[in-house]
Structures are given as C-alpha cells and as structure tokens.
Amino acid sequence: MAASERNTGKFTEECPACGSAEIVFDEERGEYVCANCGLVTEDPVIDPGPEWRHFNPDQRQRRSRTGEPVKLRLPDKGISTIIDRELRDSGGKKNPRMRRIRTWDARIKVSGSRERNFFQAFLELENLASKLQLPESVRELAASIYRKAYKEGIVRGRGIESVLGAAVFAACKEARVPRTAREIAEALGVSDENEILRAYRVLQRRLNLKQKPTEPSDHLPRFASKLGVSENVQAKAQEIIEKAKEKGITVGKGPAGVAAAALYIASILEGERRTQKEIAEVARVTEVTIRNRYKEICEALGIELHP
C-alpha cells in the first residue's frame, strides 16, 4: 500500500505479534502501531539505502545491487523472497493455488529449530524495542549479539527471554542509550531482573564483551525528559554527579539510583520539586534507594535540603 494511502489513519494489515488487522498511523511520531497490543510495526526512520558508501559514479555502479540492506533482526536477515499477498492471476482473479504455495513457503522458512528460535526471539525483540523506544541501531546490535549467543550455545538451556533481554541490555550499554535491567525485565514480562543480569554476565564471559560501565550521567537526559524538568535542573544534577564522583561516593552504586538522587536534589534546589515517588517510577528504582543516595550525596557535598 502506498505511503499516501496509509497515512490517512487506519489500514488493513496484520500485526506480526497478535494478528490484529487494526494498525493505526501515529502522525506525531511517524509510526504504525497495533491498536490491539501496542507493537510498533514500522520504524519511524527507514533507511532503504545500501550499507556501503560510494565516492564516484564508477564505485556506485560496481557496488550497486538489488534489495534492501541486510537486517540482522529478521530470521532470514531480510534476504529471502516473499510471495505477494494479493495472490491474483494476470486477469485479476484470486488464485487458491498461489495461496497454498505462499503458506508452504512461509512454513519452510521457519521449519528448522534455529529459524523458529530466531523468529520467536526477533518478534519479541521488536515488541521489546518498541516499548523501550530503542533506535534502529540498538535493535540491530541486540540481534547481532543474540545470533552470536545462539551460535555459542548460550541460548540452549536458558529461556529466550533472559538471553534476549541480556542482549538488549548489552546493546544499550554499548550504544550509550542505557536501559536498566528492571526496565527490560518488566517490558519482557520476566519477574526477576536478576535473570537478565545473570544471562548478561554469561554473554560478557562467553562472547568476550568489553564494555564500559554505564555512568549516572548516561541516564540523566532520559529521566529529565520524562520528569519534564528544565535544562537548569538537568545541568545542576550533572554538576552534583560530577562532584559526587570526585568524592568517590558513586563507586559501587547503581548508576540509575545515583542519577535519580541527583535529579531529586537538583529539582528542589532549582525550585522545580519532584517527589521521590515520581522520580522512582521514572528511574525504575525504589524510593528507599533514592533516599539512601540523596542523603549520602548531601552529606558528602555539604548540601542542605528541606524536602
């Protein structure tokens, strides 16, 4: 269906997650969303171009090919052919034989255990990435890590959700767009975030992942945006974090908790007070964590608060 036809509101297309045909176009974010389960069925930014660069017409001619760039988060990497949904002959009549061929073609593509695993995992990845608002680059990186984990036999004996969650956690850290293990676990429906962390440690060891630890500052922009505070509050929170690091009081502390405490302090100092409960909900940490961190920071930096 043409983009001009699709941007009118609702259109008929099946959601890959729940099978609903009610897909709605979100004009504000430029996304197609399933009205039934909330899955974003298409990314707001689509790169139809090749993954290579060219610097003159000759290079372009030599490197040109058909098809879209490879996508690691598709079970077949997006390089297989697809039989059209229309299933009509040259005269415009429906062709039942082509419907059967299309059905068997789809079944064959996921007939192996690996293909079935990838199909389930990457469908879950799209749903998870949609909930966490992850960019295309992070989705592809997570799919790459998951594929390596499968090849190394890490998925065997563990749930798809825990390994996939760990792959997303690792991809977010690598891309410096952090999401906490608790956020990922909640989005996946995993009851214990430690399942994600245990699987992540296995990935680190078996895949030799070398990643810098997440800093409290990495969380600040997202938390501040969700809380609706001004740039002054964010700048003050950044200043508090830097001073706390100099004093050595952030060592061994969860970065999300430190960022949350710094924002709590900054919001009060800048006259834009946010409650501990509000910040805890955004940061996915407990109010107790915020209280402990903000008291430690205030004591170390000599800050007097009157909450």
Swiss-Prot record:
Binding site for Zn(2+): 15, 18, 34, 37
NCBIfam families attached to this UniProt entry: PRK00423.1
Positions of Sequence repeats: 123-207, 218-299
GO molecular function: DNA-binding transcription factor activity; TBP-class protein binding; zinc ion binding
Bias (Basic and acidic residues) ranges: 50-69
Free-text function comment from the UniProt entry: Stabilizes TBP binding to an archaeal box-A promoter. Also responsible for recruiting RNA polymerase II to the pre-initiation complex (DNA-TBP-TFIIB).
UniProt keyword annotations, A-Z: Metal-binding, Repeat, Transcription, Transcription regulation, Zinc, Zinc-finger
A cellular-component GO term for this protein: transcription preinitiation complex
Family: Belongs to the TFIIB family.
Region (Disordered): 48-69
InterPro entries from the UniProt entry: Cyclin-like_dom (IPR013763), Cyclin-like_sf (IPR036915), TFIIB (IPR000812), TFIIB_arc (IPR023484), TFIIB_CS (IPR023486), TFIIB_cyclin (IPR013150), Znf_TFIIB (IPR013137)
Protein name stated in the entry: Transcription initiation factor IIB
Organism (species): Methanopyrus kandleri (strain AV19 / DSM 6324 / JCM 9639 / NBRC 100938)
CDD domains (alphabetical): CYCLIN_TFIIB_archaea_like_rpt2 (cd20550)
Zinc finger motifs (TFIIB-type), residue ranges: 11-42
Record gene name: tfb
Domain of life from the UniProt record: Archaea
Gene Ontology biological process terms, A to Z: transcription preinitiation complex assembly
Pfam families documented for this protein: TFIIB, Zn_Ribbon_TF
Signal peptide stretch: none
